[in-house]
A protein has these predicted regions:
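Extended, largely alpha-helical regulatory/partner-binding modules appended to the mid-to-C-terminal parts
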Residues: 1-136
């Protein structure tokens, strides 16, 4: 796995899982910290976001359609499935289809920004600020 990460520019799975968990937990600071670690490590930001979106998609599918677990198990490890089930099942999870929509928009904008992490940072602020406003309202 370390060789694959080095050759492809893919981030460690732990970074992706921490990032996804931070978003789902509504922890903007933690999500931005994870994103900063990816930027500092020189990993490809587009690959990182693609992996993150994939995991969030699977977590959302496991939440709304648990019968798809077998299909998802063909794509990711058993350990990841357990992590994603936990993330999606937590009360107050910020895992929504709108979160995925925002991240997909950021994915498209990565190549257009002067700093590849900028579109992701903006999406995080939008996603988690909306969630904060809804929680307070």
């Amino acid at each position: 796995p370390a060789e694959v990460e080095l050759v492809t520019g893919a981030p460690r799975g732990e970074l992706v899982n921490n990032f996804v968990a931070s978003i789902c937990d509504g922890k903007l600071s933690d999500a931005l910290t994870a994103l900063g670690a990816v930027a500092e490590s020189g990993n490809d930001m587009k690959v990182f976001l693609k992996l993150s979106i994939q995991k969030m998609r699977f977590a959302l599918l496991l939440k709304v359609a648990p019968e798809l677990e077998k299909m998802i198990a063909e794509e990711i490890s058993k350990e990841d499935i357990q992590i994603l089930k936990t993330i999606g099942a937590e009360k107050g999870s910020k895992l929504t289809s709108q979160t995925l929509v925002e991240l997909l928009g950021a994915y498209e904008d990565i190549g257009k920004a002067y700093a590849p992490e900028l579109p992701i940072e903006l999406a995080l602020v939008k996603i988690l600020s909306q969630n904060d406003a809804q929680a307070k309202g």
